[in-house]
A protein has these predicted regions:
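Bacterial Sec-dependent N-terminal signal peptides
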Residues: 1-24
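Glycine-rich, acidic and aromatic/proline-enriched surface loops and short helix-turn segments
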Residues: 296-300, 322-331, 338-339, 371, ...
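Aromatic- and carboxylate-enriched substrate-binding clefts and catalytic-loop regions
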Residues: 336-517, 521
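Glycine-rich, aromatic-lined ligand/substrate-binding cores of catalytic
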Residues: 509-572
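Conserved small/polar residues in nucleotide/adenosyl-binding loops
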Residues: 574-580
Length: 584
């Protein structure tokens, strides 16, 4: 009788456990207990909620995925979840801090269809003290070894009508350069593409930013409001609109990240995106040297008070190499001159290389080996601007030649996409560049996603409306700048074309291609080198604008990487105090 009772009790607990997972909820809390995640089945469909300090931010948000063999998200059961604690310490060569301690709680929630085709997908959730992240895992399984995804229906049912700060985009092919809009969520237009990160300010001074981490072999995600609901939208494969992702199993999505805090400065200092990425793939990183660089395109390749004409020639580059050397800077960039690249582009301009463009065919007026040898003799390294298309066409030959010349890195430009193919291409650039000891600076590119941990040769990305616009419009001013730390910078480094030393107030400001003006003050410009995360700081004005001028000594001394970043004082779009720290 006693033995039978034990069996009955065990059977009862097993039944209760199955019922708990199949019909009730799975819950996860951050290590400090402030952030809570829950997943339940609503009519056999998974929905999730997120709360911070008992304040609900996201409520009953559906998770559905649409594939070529049907939608996944209805007639689903929850199998037994697996809970664990994740803790690690690691170092970043380029990042917001050098020494990182990451602590999170994780649950793997197996979701399985109860009707044919009986597919299985895992929802992996991690809770940090500064946010929640989740991703979809697609394990290889009988009868399902590959997929074509039409839509990822991740949704975010916001509560409390938060204020939203976002960048609206006209379409998926974009340089991600524009003015940010601040509005209440209820008043925000439907069916407009929203870039990420987007910031949501809730009542009681609670802040949440939505972005993504570890975007690899997948399409980039955007936000989209429709019928009041906030949805994720994937960038479609080029030339059509339906297919978003194609993959063989096993496969996984990027992390969908909700950065959360009651101190907005904590979002700026957060390392959650690098925490969610794989460790460094580069065995020897001793050659990776962040630093500061010229960028003569911005100033118009100006060479005042010289006996030679500025252009695609040795004297012009020597002029700037000598400037870098005598001021203890690091890099000189070569892009070309006017609208002509340093290589044969066979096209109408930088953004439109022709079919016969050849990255290995240097224009006759330049001897790249001579320039690199001279730079080396002065303790200066060279990095090259390139359009991504001719570079990718000869990626292996080009990188080998660059290494032979002694090139340190590249600015890769005009990608303007983040569909799955372009995401793959960007990672291929990083991986192959590392084999040839080359750093990468992406321009005309999508937001970062913490991949600088895996590939620390990624120094910075553009993807912001920045000071290059001072050459043709009046959009980049201090009011625009102060939005950056609370929006795009939450995702990581940005190249902002810093360094303009010729300032004019807005009422006197004028656009000009050569020796352009900026609308910010000198002090504002200097502060941007500390506030804006970038591991390749531009010194983009002319030697004449800098040498002997107040503030240039600071530019020469300011680091491009820090050992610690804290934000003790910040008010959205008004001000912030960011005392970074460098060991020693």
């Amino acid at each position: 009788m006693k033995k039978e009772s034990i069996y009955l009790i065990l059977a009862f607990f097993i039944l209760c456990a199955h019922s708990l997972y199949a019909n009730k909820s799975v819950r996860l809390s951050s290590p400090n207990g402030k952030i809570k995640f829950s997943l339940v089945l609503d009519k056999n469909s998974p929905v999730y909620s997120v709360a911070f300090n008992k304040q609900t931010l996201i409520q009953d948000s559906p998770l559905t995925l649409t594939f070529d063999n049907g939608a996944f998200g209805e007639n689903v059961k929850i199998n037994k979840p697996v809970f664990s604690t994740k803790e690690e310490t690691y170092e970043l060569i380029v990042g917001k801090a050098k020494h990182i301690h990451s602590l999170s709680k994780e649950v793997i929630i197996p979701l399985e269809e109860t009707v044919q085709p009986f597919r299985k997908i895992n929802l992996v959730v991690r809770a940090f003290d500064d946010g929640i992240a989740f991703r979809y895992e697609f394990p290889k399984q009988k009868g399902w070894d590959s997929y074509i995804m039409y839509d990822e229906g991740t949704s975010f049912n916001l509560q409390g009508n938060p204020s939203v700060t976002t960048l609206f985009l006209p379409n998926y092919q974009s340089s991600h350069e524009g003015k940010y809009t601040v509005t209440d969520y209820a008043d925000m237009d439907n069916k407009r593409l929203m870039d990420m990160p987007a910031l949501f300010s809730f009542p009681n001074h609670v802040y949440m930013a939505i972005t993504e981490a570890a975007v690899r072999d997948y399409a980039g995600m955007y936000l989209w409001k429709e019928n009041g609901a906030l949805l994720g939208k994937l960038s479609p494969k080029l030339g059509q609109e339906r297919i978003k992702v194609e993959a063989s199993l096993p496969h996984q999505s990027p992390w969908r990240v909700l950065m959360i805090s009651d101190q907005i400065g904590s979002l700026i200092a957060s390392n959650i995106l690098t925490n969610l990425n794989e460790p460094c793939k580069i065995e020897d990183t001793s050659w990776i040297k962040p630093g500061k660089t010229t960028f003569t395109w911005w100033n118009g390749n100006v060479v005042p008070d010289t006996t030679f004409l500025g252009g695609n020639n040795f004297p012009t580059n020597k002029y700037y190499i000598d400037f870098v050397a005598r001021n203890g800077l690091d890099y000189h960039s070569i892009y070309g001159n006017a609208e002509q690249a340093w290589y044969d582009e066979d096209g109408a301009g930088f953004g439109s290389p022709g079919p016969k463009a050849d990255i290995l065919k240097v224009v006759p007026s330049l001897n790249m080996q001579e320039i690199c040898d001279y730079a080396k003799s002065q303790g200066v390294r060279i990095h090259l601007w390139t359009n991504w298309k001719p570079l990718y066409a000869k990626i292996d030959e080009a990188f080998a030649q660059f290494e032979k010349w002694g090139i340190a890195g590249m600015m890769i430009d005009f990608m303007d996409r983040d569909d799955q193919e372009m995401i793959r291409i960007q990672e291929e650039f990083l991986a192959k560049a590392a084999k040839h000891h080359l750093f990468v600076q992406f321009h005309g590119a999508c937001k970062p996603s913490g991949l600088n941990r895996t590939y620390p040769n990624e120094f910075t990305r553009e993807g912001t409306l920045n000071y290059e616009h001072c050459k043709w419009d009046k959009d980049t001013d201090a009011d625009h700048d102060i939005h950056m730390p609370f929006t795009r910078l939450l995702a990581g480094a940005t190249d902002y074309h810093l360094g303009g030393f010729r300032s004019l107030p807005r009422d006197k400001f004028k656009n000009q291609e050569r020796n352009p003006y900026v609308m910010s003050t000198r002090c504002h410009m200097l502060a941007m080198y500390v506030v804006l995360e970038s591991y390749l700081g531009m010194i983009c004005d002319t030697p004449e604008a800098y040498e002997g001028q107040p503030g240039f000594e600071f530019l020469k001394a300011v680091p491009t990487t820090w050992d610690q970043t804290v934000v003790p004082n910040a008010v959205s779009y008004t001000h912030l105090t960011l005392p970074t720290k460098l060991e020693g």
